[in-house]
């Protein structure tokens, strides 16, 4: 739930990137159809925010997300995640799972494909549990 203390870092039709006051970056997908340029721009801003924050923690809210297309999956696997780990310091991803089962499957395929990257993903049904896990990782890191 967004409130006035959240700092929106970037927003387009794909979703919203927020510098969460609890101490991590937050990516929230919208349910709209994604255009490649907008998708790439959106994820690029996530990378920049993570690099600026330097804590390696990202809350990924996929509740309203539609499934990744094959091209989106390739982009995330081959370009965005490796770059965000290297340039953004991405280490911990707390994913609030999508309502759409096909979106869940698409995300699982991405995570399986990048399991060699030095990062951890955990899936959650509830936002509060995702936040608690992410903050715990931050304290441990």
Regions found by a protein language model. Name each.
Residues 1-141:
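Amphipathic, Lys/Arg-enriched alpha-helical "gate/interface" segment within cytosolic domains
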């Amino acid at each position: 739930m967004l409130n006035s203390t959240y700092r929106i870092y970037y927003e387009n039709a794909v979703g919203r990137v927020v510098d969460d006051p609890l101490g991590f970056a937050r990516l929230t997908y919208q349910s709209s159809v994604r255009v490649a340029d907008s998708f790439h721009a959106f994820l690029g801003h996530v990378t920049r925010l993570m690099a600026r924050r330097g804590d390696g923690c990202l809350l990924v809210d996929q509740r309203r997300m539609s499934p990744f297309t094959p091209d989106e999956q390739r982009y995330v696997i081959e370009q965005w995640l490796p770059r965000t780990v290297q340039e953004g310091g991405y280490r911990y991803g707390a994913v609030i799972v999508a309502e759409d089962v096909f979106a869940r499957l698409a995300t699982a395929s991405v995570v399986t494909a990048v399991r060699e990257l030095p990062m951890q993903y955990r899936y959650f049904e509830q936002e509060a549990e995702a936040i608690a896990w992410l903050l715990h990782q931050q304290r441990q890191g």
